[in-house]
UniProtKB/Swiss-Prot annotation:
The presence of a 'disulfide through disulfide knot' structurally defines this protein as a knottin. The keyword Secreted applies. Keywords: Disulfide bond, Ion channel impairing toxin, Knottin, Neurotoxin, Potassium channel impairing toxin, Secreted, Toxin, Voltage-gated potassium channel impairing toxin. This is Potassium channel toxin gamma-KTx 4.7. One of its GO terms (cellular component) is extracellular region. Expressed by the venom gland. The lineage of its organism: Eukaryota, Metazoa, Ecdysozoa, Arthropoda, Chelicerata. It comes from the Eukaryota. It holds the Pfam family Toxin_17. One of its GO terms (molecular function) is toxin activity. Disulfide bonds join C5-C23, C11-C34, C20-C39, C24-C41.
Length: 43
């Protein structure tokens, strides 16, 4: 689910958030991005 993306997805310092984005999409969100090195899913 969406909350597990925050724990599972590593966010690199410089904007690489492919893992986060993928995880959020699987959880049913449109996209994910990184805020302060944490994965956030966009509804």
């Amino acid at each position: 689910d969406r909350d597990s993306c925050v724990d599972k997805s590593k966010c690199a310092k410089y904007g690489y958030y492919g893992q986060c984005d993928e995880c959020c999409k699987k959880a049913g969100d449109r996209a994910g991005n990184c805020v302060y090195l944490k994965c956030k899913c966009n509804q």
